[in-house]
From Swiss-Prot:
This is NADH-quinone oxidoreductase subunit B. It catalyses: a quinone + NADH + 5 H(+)(in) = a quinol + NAD(+) + 4 H(+)(out). GO terms for cellular component: plasma membrane; respiratory chain complex I. It is a peripheral membrane protein. GO terms for biological process: aerobic respiration; electron transport coupled proton transport. Binds 1 [4Fe-4S] cluster. InterPro entries: NADH_UbQ_OxRdtase-like_20kDa, NADH_UQ_OxRdtase_20Kd_su. Its main location: membrane. GO terms for molecular function: 4 iron, 4 sulfur cluster binding; iron ion binding; NADH dehydrogenase (ubiquinone) activity; NADH:ubiquinone reductase (non-electrogenic) activity; quinone binding. Its cofactor is [4Fe-4S] cluster.
Length: 160
């Protein structure tokens, strides 16, 4: 957990940032924004073989209950406003994981008139998972990378 020191008589000292970030990494609640074939791999990662529950990742049905949005698949111009609305409804602090080459940069349909060339043109993306479609293992690796990123963030502002 990042305990900085153990004092005599059973006292443990640590920073509030370390404790808060530890709790946040163990309770990521994603809302799915599955748009194409990448969503099948996302569902696969949530099933019994890979079991995302062991990482504290539990899929939520509503964006108001979630703090992570997984964008999986081809994002079209028509869906861009819906993606932004879902992002705005996420609880703070919120994170976005872009899954698959279509969500990362348009993918195979990059030159189509109706495709947004990456989810990062609509919402800020924290982690990119490459692949077409990425495997469930790649998604889990991306989620672990997001947990590492959350551990490094500073939650409480300090005057230095």
């Amino acid at each position: 957990m990042g305990i900085e020191g153990v004092l005599k008589k059973g006292f443990i000292t640590t920073s509030a940032d370390t404790v808060l970030n530890y709790m946040r990494t163990g309770s990521l609640w994603p809302v799915t924004f599955g748009l194409a074939c990448c969503a099948v791999e996302m569902m696969h990662a949530g099933m019994a073989r890979y079991d995302l529950d062991r990482f504290g990742i539990i899929f939520r049905p509503s964006p108001r209950q979630a703090d992570l949005m997984i964008v999986a698949g081809t994002l079209t111009n028509k869906m861009a406003s819906a993606l932004r609305r879902v992002y705005d409804q996420l609880a703070e602090p919120r994170w976005v994981l872009s899954m698959g080459s279509c969500a990362n940069g348009g993918g195979y349909y990059h030159y189509s008139y109706s495709v947004v060339r990456g989810a990062d043109r609509v919402v800020p993306v924290d982690v990119y998972v490459p692949g077409c479609p990425p495997t469930a293992e790649a998604l889990i690796y991306g989620l672990i990378q997001l947990q590492q990123k959350i551990k490094r963030t500073s939650t409480i502002a300090r005057d230095e």
